Amino acid sequence: MLEKVVIANRGEIALRILRACKELGIKTVAVHSTADRELKHVLLADETVCIGPAQSAKSYLNIPAIIAAAEVTCADAIHPGYGFLSENADFAEQVESSGFIFIGPTADVIRLMGDKVSAINAMKKAGVPCVPGSDGPLSSDIAKNKEIAKRIGYPIIIKASGGGGGRGMRVVRSEDTLEESIAMTKAEAKAAFNNDMVYMEKYLENPRHVEIQVLADTHGNAVYLAERDCSMQRRHQKVVEEAPAPGITEEVRRDIGSRCAKACVEIGYRGAGTFEFLYENGEFYFIEMNTRIQVEHPVTEMITGVDLVKEQLRIASGLPISFKQEDIKVKGHAVECRINAEDPKTFLPSPGKVVHLHSPGGLGVRWDSHIYAGYTVPPHYDSMIAKLITYGDVREVAIRRMQNALSETIIDGIKTNIPLHDLILDDENFQKGGTNIHYLEKKLGMHE
């Protein structure tokens, strides 16, 4: 087992990693910026190292400082969490070449899956269903591009190969605007990602976002841990997630899940990962793979009983996954609300001091958060301050528990998006299940 781990992150995920390390008897090193001296996990870690000023670029994205922290504390491994450097192949490479274990896949696999074109090709080869598209980057031959668009069928979407988070994409509904749209997306991609490679895909009008959680070890084992539905989104950012996805049968789950597990073995995957799909009319279409732990991992933990972060640490120690595929049984239903320090009407961040805090409790209620009364939410980072997760034997119970838990939650001193969650959970279409990825934005358009 690993002896000492550097937690190269902040906030709730850093605390989540610290808890898993403590349960396994692993010593922890919290690296932090000058703005984060009072973070919960920093106060609880065995050792702490300040790696730079408040700006992420000079601290949490500062590769030499993080590796130096591992060196001075004689750590074995670095856990990147999510966000920041978690999907940075150069970081993974430097961690391993400096003699430490990167808790995640190899740099080569991160590179392969980080480039959308190579990822789609790898998935097709492994038998994972993909969105019909250009099968590679678009050339400057407009006649050829028009031909591809005709074959796929309008509407189509032009996407940047190095893009993500909703940037570098443009929907095209007819041939008249195709040439201009490709040129504009290329220019945007060059400016944002320093890579003007773009590709074309069929644009699905009303899909759901359904993703498959996987784990793979270094002994040739890979398992899938059911699916999550993350369709409740605003500006491509997930707001509410749930597991399992409403309406997905065990047979469908087994088919898509086993394909993902097989793909993990074929690409030499290691650790926790997620295959993201668009799901429309009973069909799955692969969009990307996240080569890290995800924000919404707790809903999967609640319905499977597996501690995903502990499994990450075990796999990084060279141990096999602690269970077999047939041991995984989906039981009950879980819902997660991402609680952000933001104005619920304008969505602008609302940093500041938490004056009073009362977190909810009771049967089937989980509160993953680093905040406490007296803690100041800094303005420099992502606005998520907590994740509230509820579990029930059926979906209706999980939703009702979430409504109760939200009504119990008191966070005074800053604004939060709890009113938005109340609105979503009260919505009759959400309660029925199966809303698509555009639903929330349309609903908010009606409420503005």
What is the predicted role of each segment?
Residues M1-K125, D135-E147, V397:
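ATP-binding N-terminal substructure of ATP-dependent carboxylate-amine bond-forming enzymes
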Residues I7-R16, A20-L24, T48, E71-T73, ...:
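ATP-dependent carboxylate activation and anion-phosphoryl transfer catalytic cores
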Residues V29, H79, I101-I103, V131, ...:
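Structural detector of well-ordered beta-strand residues that form the stable sheet scaffold
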Residues S59, L112, L138, V171, ...:
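A structural signal for short, well-ordered beta-strand elements
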Residues G81-F84, T106-I110, S134-L138, G166-V171, ...:
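Conserved short loop/turn motifs at secondary-structure junctions
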Residues A122, Y154, R167, A187, ...:
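N-terminal phosphate-binding caps/lids of nucleotide- and nucleic-acid-binding domains
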Residues I148-I157:
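Acidic/histidine-enriched active-site and ligand-binding environments that engage anionic O-linkages
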